[in-house]
């Protein structure tokens, strides 16, 4: 299920108002694999606890542009490590997360599928919601 920005804000504000929410974000729309952990402060403003990015510039340089199949393979190879680094750097544990967010578009479909599948797996294993961004 895809949520609009307003629906996401309402879900966070109305349904989960009891604590400072911690969300793991996953990005894989093109040629960078990224994971970030954010937590809202007392004024409900998101604070970035970690932001880890792995670029694929060198992978695609010789082709003069992004090759979707190579980009997707690189995401598959790196997404676990990037996510673990983001969690470690943030100082939180997976059990502390309140939701998982992953890029749903726009982007290269094969790349988006990697991040969404990974996000869905993490969310499912922790019994959390997956927010499509």
What is each stretch, according to the model?
Residues 39, 120, 124:
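Short, well-ordered alpha-helices that flank and scaffold nucleotide-derived cofactor binding pockets
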């Amino acid at each position: 299920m895809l949520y609009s920005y307003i629906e996401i804000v309402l879900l966070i504000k109305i349904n989960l108002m009891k604590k400072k929410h911690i969300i793991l974000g996953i990005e894989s729309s093109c040629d960078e694999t990224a994971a970030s952990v954010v937590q809202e402060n007392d004024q409900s403003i998101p604070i970035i606890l970690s932001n880890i990015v792995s670029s694929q510039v060198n992978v695609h340089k010789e082709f003069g542009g992004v090759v979707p199949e190579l980009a997707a393979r690189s995401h598959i190879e790196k997404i676990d490590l990037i996510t673990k680094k983001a969690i470690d750097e943030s100082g939180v544990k997976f059990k502390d997360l309140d939701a998982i967010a992953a890029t749903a578009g726009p982007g290269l479909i094969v790349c988006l599928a990697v991040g969404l599948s990974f996000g869905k797996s993490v969310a499912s294993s922790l019994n959390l919601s997956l927010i499509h961004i």
